[in-house]
Regions:
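HKD-type phospholipase D/PLD-like phosphodiesterase module
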Residues: 2-120
């Protein structure tokens, strides 16, 4: 799973719990999150996932943003591959405000399901 924004809100916690449950069941679970887009993702949530066997990695952590151009080099992908046969991709991040509507104006991001050879 790869996402620009993963928030520590109701939606983020629900997804984290699903990932934790799957990792504890023996499935291979990997999460890549953007270090800037997901800056509100807590160490506590990351630690809980890690302790359950979820592999997590931050994309391009920024240590000193005023000394680097890496702060604008971000990963905006939103991809989930479930089993090598089904994947989801699109513009929806993992955050409650994607369901609430007017948080940042009126917009509608979409995700789509892909199956078959295109997933592999």
């Amino acid at each position: 799973m790869e996402y620009y924004i993963i928030r520590d809100d109701r939606i983020g916690h629900t997804i984290a719990e699903i990932l934790i449950r799957k990792a504890r069941a023996g499935l291979e679970v990997r999460v890549i999150y953007d270090a800037v887009g997901s800056w509100r993702l807590s160490r506590k949530t990351l630690r809980r996932m890690h302790d359950a066997g979820v592999e997590t990695a931050a994309f391009e952590p920024v240590r000193f943003p005023w000394f680097t151009t890496r702060v604008t080099h971000r990963n905006h992908r939103k991809i989930v591959v479930t089993d090598g046969k089904v994947a989801y991709l699109g513009g929806i991040n993992i955050a409650k405000y994607y369901l609430d509507g007017d948080y940042m104006g009126k917009w509608r991001d979409e995700h789509l399901r892909v199956e078959g050879d295109a997933v592999a």
